[in-house]
Curated annotation (Swiss-Prot):
Top-level division of the source organism's lineage: Eukaryota
Record-given protein name: Interactor protein for cytohesin exchange factors 1
Assembly information from the UniProt record: Interacts with guanine-nucleotide exchange factors PSCD1, PSCD2, PSCD3 and PSCD4.
Residues in PH domain copies: 13-112
Low complexity bias: start-end ranges: 144-153
Species name: Mus musculus (Mouse)
Length: 406
């Protein structure tokens, strides 16, 4: 079993722990090449988790036979590497120089004070794809017939001597059945041995062997035992009793196998969910990039994209958290509105003055229609001409109208 299957809580008191950036193995062009992990040093083992409450480590390294040094080839500041000349190098980076020095001291102490690992011990484990997946297949009903399948025969020819010894032990045990009085004792021993083998199937799974492989061992062993029994035993009653015994044991063994096969289904489902989360995170990065370009009013090529009326309306309604900036923005918006109104008034006046067929009647009609504009014009002239009273501003004389018309 992988040593990564240990939660951050189960590690207990650590020699050193903290947040570090780890360089990805295959960094894409748009995504970030460094990812933040919670790194824990425990003895000669270095674990990194996605968060402090993670139930399983994202990676594990046994620091024996590794070297720790600063990574001057990396562009990122405060980076260091854990290197092995024959395996691979792991790159980490700290937030500041002080944290990097602490990690270098702790890791250097862990490397120098540990013995080299044995061949059977796991050196490092990093990603979900590196874990051996358990093959889950529905086993065929064993002992349905005395003849074995071609796949089983091929496996039997290439099996190890230990597997052959187990099959011979089963055949020798069956050959001892010669009398009805001895049949019950040998049957009970056979039940115990068969149940022990079935119950030990999870151990083979932990060692890295698939369940179907262990089940083929049992089927082949008993098929060879039944084939060896036919020429040696001449007693028909004992042979029939043995078949009944095996058929009764089949039901219990199949039930036990079903119980053991339910666990890998959950593991396979969790792996599929993890892969889907990785794909969704990659898609989210592209989505974030597109949204950031859209907020900056930029095209995918980096060109300035013209704002639409809807975006302008949203920007007018949107408020800023800073009150001073909000006041300035409001003043700019009001000035823009005033400018539009003045431009409209100027267009109305130009339309009147540019008319070559302008008469007194047309002027009166225009004056009635644009009363507010006339009042605004006289109000602007009032500070420049102090002799004009407010009544004259509100009620202009006929002479003024004539002068304006001329």
């Amino acid at each position: 079993m992988s040593r990564r299957r240990i939660s951050c809580k189960d590690l207990g008191h650590a020699d050193c722990q903290g947040w570090l950036y780890k360089k990805k193995e295959k960094g894409t062009f748009l995504s970030n090449k460094w990812k933040k992990f919670w790194v824990v040093l425990k003895g000669s083992s270095l674990y990194w988790y996605s968060n402090q409450m993670a139930e399983k480590a994202d990676g594990f390294v046994n620091l024996s036979d590794f070297t720790v040094e600063r990574a001057s080839e990396c562009k990122k500041k405060n980076a260091f590497k854990i290197n092995h000349p024959q395996i691979k190098a792991f790159y980490f980076a700290a937030e500041n120089l002080q944290e990097m020095n602490v990690w270098l001291n702790k890791l250097g102490f862990a490397v120098t004070h540990q013995e080299s690992i044995t061949k059977d011990e796991e050196c490092y484990s990093e990603s979900e794809q590196e874990d051996p997946e358990v093959a889950v297949e529905a086993p065929p009903p064993p002992y349905a017939s005395t003849t074995s399948s071609p796949v089983a025969a091929q496996w039997a020819s290439s099996s190890s001597p230990k597997r052959r010894e187990t099959s011979c032990s089963f055949s020798s045990l069956e050959n001892t059945v010669k009398a009805p009085s001895q049949f019950s004792s040998s049957g009970s021993k056979e039940r115990q041995s068969w149940h022990n083998i079935v119950n030990s199937s999870p151990a083979t799974e932990d060692a890295g062997l698939p369940l179907t492989f262990a089940e083929q061992v049992h089927t082949l062993a008993f098929s060879e035992a039944s084939n060896c029994q036919a020429p040696e035993n001449n007693c028909i009653t004992s042979e029939g009793g043995l078949l009944n015994l095996l058929s009764s044991d089949d039901t219990s063994s199949l039930n036990n196998n079903k119980d053991h096969l339910t666990v890998p289904d959950r593991a396979a489902g969790s792996r599929m969910a993890d892969r889907e989360e990785i794909k969704s995170s990659e898609d989210d990065e592209m989505e974030k990039l597109y949204k950031s370009l859209e907020q900056a009013s930029l095209s995918p090529l980096g060109d300035r994209r013209p704002s639409t009326k809807k975006e302008l309306r949203k920007s007018f309604v949107k408020r800023c958290k800073n009150p001073s900036i909000n006041e300035k923005l409001h003043k700019i918006r009001t000035l823009n509105s005033t400018l539009k109104c003045k431009e409209h008034d100027l267009a109305m006046i130009n339309q009147l003055l540019d008319d070559p067929k302008l008469t007194a009647r047309k002027y009166r009609e225009w004056k009635v229609m644009n009363t507010l504009l006339i009042q605004d014009i006289y109000q602007q002239q009032a500070p420049q001409d102090p002799e004009v009273t407010p009544q004259e501003v509100m009620n202009p004389t006929s002479s003024d109208c004539v002068e304006n018309s001329l």
